[in-house]
């Protein structure tokens, strides 16, 4: 067998470790992008859904508020 360099598998080991590091880098970037997407969706829902519903609930609460009875009605 013709052998150019006697490195005892060092080149193959380095190439495999580079593949592992590249894979971990891709996974990390994907996770960071997923977290960024979650924050973007939360900001969108906050401005498009949560805030208007909160305003509608405050209007409903003020509309449904019942004033207490005057004290003169309670006197017997």
Swiss-Prot record:
The record's Gene Ontology biological-process terms are: disruption of cellular anatomical structure in another organism; symbiont-mediated suppression of host cytoplasmic pattern recognition receptor signaling pathway via inhibition of IRF3 activity; viral budding from Golgi membrane
The residue ranges for the Virion surface side of the membrane come to 1-14
- Ranges of the Intravirion topological domain: 36-76
Family matches, as InterPro entries = E_protein_aCoV, E_protein_CoV
Location comes to:
Host Golgi apparatus membrane; Host endoplasmic reticulum
UniProt KW keywords: Apoptosis, Host endoplasmic reticulum, Host Golgi apparatus, Host membrane, Host-virus interaction, Inhibition of host innate immune response by virus, Inhibition of host IRF3 by virus, Inhibition of host RLR pathway by virus, Membrane, Transmembrane, Transmembrane helix, Viral immunoevasion
Identify the GO cellular component terms for this protein.
host cell endoplasmic reticulum; host cell Golgi membrane; host cell nucleus; membrane
Keyword rRNA-binding in record: no
Membrane-crossing ranges are: 15-35
Q: What is its main location?
A: host cell
Per the record, the similarity remark reads: Belongs to the alphacoronaviruses E protein family.
Q: What does this protein do?
A: Plays a central role in virus morphogenesis and assembly. Acts as a viroporin and self-assembles in host membranes forming pentameric protein-lipid pores that allow ion transport. Also plays a role in the induction of apoptosis. Counteracts the production of type I interferon by interacting with host IRF3 component and preventing its translocation to the host nucleus.
Q: Which HAMAP family match?
A: ALPHA_CORONA_E (MF_04205)
* Record protein name field: Envelope small membrane protein
């Amino acid at each position: 067998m013709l052998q150019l360099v006697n490195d005892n598998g060092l080149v193959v080991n380095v190439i495999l470790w580079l593949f592992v590091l590249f894979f971990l880098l891709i996974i990390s970037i994907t996770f960071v992008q997923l977290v960024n997407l979650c924050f973007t969706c939360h900001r969108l829902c906050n401005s498009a859904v949560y805030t208007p519903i909160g305003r509608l609930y405050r209007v409903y609460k003020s509309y449904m508020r019942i004033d207490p009875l005057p004290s003169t009605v309670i006197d017997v």
